[in-house]
């Protein structure tokens, strides 16, 4: 993740009047980096990396970004003054000794199998999507760890300062003691069979919300003190084989009128489903008529080893057992047509496999909600690829549906907070399913299995519909102007306008951004606060993009809609 402005791509060391003096001062660094550059493997952008390294050292920058350069290694001597190092989306298999001053390390999306000793000053560690089997000793000041999507089998002792720990999709079988400082924990998709005692804070702000996400494990036991947590705490235990006794006990205790403990979410079933998956090609061909199955099978055999293929196969089998599959006319044909599109687009297939990987085998309505999301993925992909380039009205309709679904998700999220005992999937699906006709939601299934236990009332639905229509009237055009598929259309069909808008944005970055961020921090009394600076920077950037993209959106829509008689605003 980037936390600084893009570098000046026109920077040239040869143009720097005091380069010779500087290069003498840092001769050892420059010599080592030049030697490292000459050892580049094919495809590595080490020349750009060295330019960035020298610029950082000469200017004594505190931040160094070497993202997306296809680097297989880093030089042994990094600039010693840096506090922030970003090296994401490379091909790194190891890291050199890290600067003693380092506070922020983002090394996600690499091939790291080990980490070096971490500096004592480190506060933020992001190593998502690597090949780590263990973490080194953790610094005492560390506040944030993201080690999702690795191969961790155990964790070291956690520092007492730790506030965020995310280790989703690993192979953990147990957790160490959790520190009292912890505010967010995500250990979803591991092999945990139990949880340690949850830290109970004696003193913390009532505004601090604490989240423990432990879904998709093998948890059969929960700590005895779990109900002693504050109402500001949320614990997600869905898709774990909790015994019926524990589920009944949780249900009874959290339903008491005087209950003031945490919000606890767990699945209605015990999760003891058969986890054997049949071959992907077999699961796919089952959706097609017999005269097509042989050809379809040959095509899909080629995708058997793609990431998430097994879970996608299981998802298709569970989808065939949903209420919609059993009762909705034309549903099988709809799924078959969608599968044909997936077979011809590797990008769409990859996206869809990833979405389906989040579906559980133990909850029918989660499968139904995932099907909704997959249909959204298809439509957004088609829009981004140009399907609606010549049909602005259809693109607006699609955007309007995506906007309505976003608002419903916000409403569902707020509703979930009011319920102690609930499978949140039922709440999200209830709003989409029950309002599908009134809000013209083409991607939503028309039936769900557990609406009766969703906690969503008729009054909730009426209020939600009114809120969606009100926010659509006031916010849709601003939202649409920032929508990715619309930007893709503008780049292809309005190249000159798009280029002008981008030029405006970068002029603002160069001439106004820093001052506007500084003014905002000064007004709020937060000058020098790094977190506040990042937040203020994001706000300024969004406001700028909103203004610039809204202007070009208004111009293009006014022209196109006047030509075909369409309207931007309708119910």
Swiss-Prot record:
Q: Which reaction does it catalyse?
A: S-ubiquitinyl-[E2 ubiquitin-conjugating enzyme]-L-cysteine + [acceptor protein]-L-lysine = [E2 ubiquitin-conjugating enzyme]-L-cysteine + N(6)-ubiquitinyl-[acceptor protein]-L-lysine
Region annotation Interaction with target proteins: where it falls in the sequence: 1-260
Q: Can you give the residue ranges of the NEL domain?
A: 279-571
**Which compartments does it reside in?**
Secreted; Host cytoplasm
Q: Which Pfam families match?
A: LRR_TTSS, NEL
Kindly give the PROSITE patterns that the UniProt entry links to this protein: LRR, NEL
Record-listed E.C. numbers: 2.3.2.27
Q: What class of enzyme is it?
A: transferase
Q: Where is this region: Linker?
A: 269-278
Record's comment on post-translational modification: Ubiquitinated in the presence of host E1 ubiquitin-activating enzyme, E2 ubiquitin-conjugating enzyme UBE2D3 and ubiquitin.
Q: Where is this region: E3 ubiquitin-protein ligase catalytic domain?
A: 279-571
One GO biological process term is: protein ubiquitination
Q: Which UniProt keywords apply?
A: Host cytoplasm, Leucine-rich repeat, Repeat, Secreted, Transferase, Ubl conjugation, Ubl conjugation pathway, Virulence
Domains: entry comment = The LRR (leucine-rich repeat) domain forms a slightly curved solenoid and may mediate interaction with target proteins.
Instruction: State the family it belongs to.
Output: Belongs to the LRR-containing bacterial E3 ligase family.
Q: Which NCBIfam families match?
A: IpaH_Shig (NF046045)
The identity of this protein, by name, is E3 ubiquitin-protein ligase ipaH3
Gene of this entry: ipaH3
